[in-house]
Amino acid sequence: VIERYTLPEMGNLWSEAYKLKTWLQVEIAVCEAQAELGYIPSEAVAKIKAKANFDPKRVLEIEAEVRHDMIAFLTNVNEYVGDAGRYIHLGLTSSDVLDTALALQLIASLDLLLQRLEDLIQAIRHKAREHRYTVMIGRSHGIHAEPMTFGFKLAGWLAEVLRHQERLQILQKTIAVGKISGAVGTYANIEPRVEVIACQKLGLKPDTASTQVISRDIHGDYVQQLALVAASIERFAVEIRNLQKTDVLEVEEFFAKGQKGSSAMPHKRNPIRSERLTGIARLVRSHASAVLENVALWHERDMSHSSVERVVLPDACILTHFMIHEITDLVTNLLVYPQNMERNLNCYGGVVFSQRVLLTLIDKGLNREEAYAIVQQSAHTAWNKPEGNFRDLISKDPRVTQKLSPPEIDACFDPQYHLRHLDQVYQRLGI
């Protein structure tokens, strides 16, 4: 990922140095396990732990010659360790180290993602509480529907993010799998107990039945969960974009002092951060497709997944982390305009209260078809005229006034009627 969308803490987890660090962690854990079981001398392990190191530049130099990154790494480590290095990688295949170390990177990435997600949860919770009773129009198909509150909209966002939090917490357990089982996974040259002990030292569980690699359905699940997070963030961003349209302007991205919106038009205040998130979500979604292609490896392994994962796994983690950070800041500093919400709610003279009028007429004895025709006629008349006023039309329709008194008509246009159950939703979410 380009630096523009990389936050330092997540970028560090996917650096070459950090990757090699996890490789060394795995190699040392295996050595310790073998020593505990008496397969290699404890003195050798002590020397390995004291001297083992690596130089990323040197590893690349060696790789340019041998064309194998794991061999290059082991060669470089042995340059530091000396004779005790012959016990490193004993009975292992490259994927034992690669897949087990990858699990460590993915777990560390999840920890950061969950930290950021908690920040987002708190930001949405605070904003939802602040605008619990900020009345606005709800829309379906992009068309005015019925009254709601901005806080209620945010409550829906919160519920969605809480589901993501739960899924990522489950994913922490799913991805925490290592394999130290050798070529094709048969433990031919390494004791299964070594795998158990080494994985325990690394905070992992042994894969139940690995081949030469850990099955890629696990990694497919991982990126799909990140793609779901990205999709929700995109939904929030698209909502901000739609509500920031000039003729709507119910919310707006914070516009900093000195910020410019357009090189040509000085008046512009564009929702550029929300647009950026919309674009990045497309990338993360595309990565979910790529990792699914990795599941169908040949026999006990091939290497077709490797090139994909070198790009997709870091990118998915880095981009999702950036997206969570960005949407958290957007929500925290979002400008909300209740007066514009009220203006939009009341345009066309309260036409959005049509269902309330309909149901009240039915309650007064009209059949549904007749009541619907009466209300629709006034609603469409108001809708099709610039100065149309649904409330006035209803109040002057004798078919309505025969059934409803003026106070009963007024009651149909009270937005509070639509909000009377919202507290139950807030209680469910603990807002």
Tell me the role of every PLM-derived stretch.
Residues I40, V248-L249, N367:
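Conserved hydrophobic residue
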Residues V30-A33, L113, L117-L120, I124-K127, ...:
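Amphipathic alpha-helices that form helix-helix packing interfaces
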Residues V1-Y187, E191-I197, P206, Q259-S262, ...:
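A helix-coil-helix interface module used to build multimeric assemblies
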Residues H164, V213-H305, R310:
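Glycine-rich anion/phosphate-binding loop at the beta-strand->alpha-helix junction
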Residues E195-Q212, R216:
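Active-site-adjacent "gating/activation" loops or surface patches in catalytic cores
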Residues E32, Q105-L117, L226-R235, I240, ...:
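Alpha-helical support elements that line or immediately flank enzyme active sites
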Residues F152, G220-L228, R356-K364:
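Short, well-ordered beta-strand elements within core beta-sheets of diverse protein domains
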Residues V1-T22, I62-V66, D83, M265-I431:
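Glycine-rich cofactor/substrate-binding loops
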